């Protein structure tokens, strides 16, 4: 009887050791899927808001330069959650908006590499031009000094020649 109990406990312990990491991985996968859905939805919402501005410009209510300024101001001030923000670069790699960082805005980032050597802006632009999608790279979180892995959703906004994105740190 005692031997059967010890054997049963050993089997249960082995099952727990095998299954618990799988359960943890399943939760990580579900969380990543939820995060992916959130950032895609947020970019689509931002694009919709930019389209409203572009429509007014196309109807002659404002110049293209003024519409782009309004769009940049919108993205600069648009946030979600506790630290969600948007950025935009031109399809040539010139930064339009990056959480209000005036030291970056207006600079060409096309050749910028992350800490792993990835030309991430080129990847972002290529993904957006191909219809939008997810890109993974390393980036420094606002207020920190070390780069962290980041997953972003990006899409092009053709009326302004922009790539708009947002993401989350993994």
Region locations from a protein language model:
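N-terminal membrane-sensor/transducer module of prokaryotic signaling receptors
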Residues: 1-170
């Amino acid at each position: 009887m005692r031997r059967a109990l010890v054997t049963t406990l050993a089997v249960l312990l082995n099952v727990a050791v095998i299954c618990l990491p799988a359960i943890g991985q399943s939760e990580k996968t579900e969380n990543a899927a939820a995060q992916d859905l959130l950032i895609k939805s947020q970019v689509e919402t931002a694009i919709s808001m930019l389209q409203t501005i572009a429509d007014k410009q196309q109807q002659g209510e404002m110049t293209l330069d003024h519409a782009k300024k309004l769009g940049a101001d919108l993205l600069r001030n648009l946030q979600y959650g506790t630290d969600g923000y948007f950025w935009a670069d031109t399809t040539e790699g010139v930064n339009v908006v990056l959480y209000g960082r005036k030291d970056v805005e207006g600079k060409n980032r096309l050749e910028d590499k992350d800490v792993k050597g990835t030309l991430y802006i080129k990847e972002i632009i290529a993904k957006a031009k191909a219809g939008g999608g997810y890109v993974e790279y390393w980036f420094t979180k606002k207020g920190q000094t070390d780069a962290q892995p980041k997953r972003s959703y990006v899409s092009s906004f053709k009326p302004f020649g922009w790539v708009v994105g947002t993401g989350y740190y993994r």
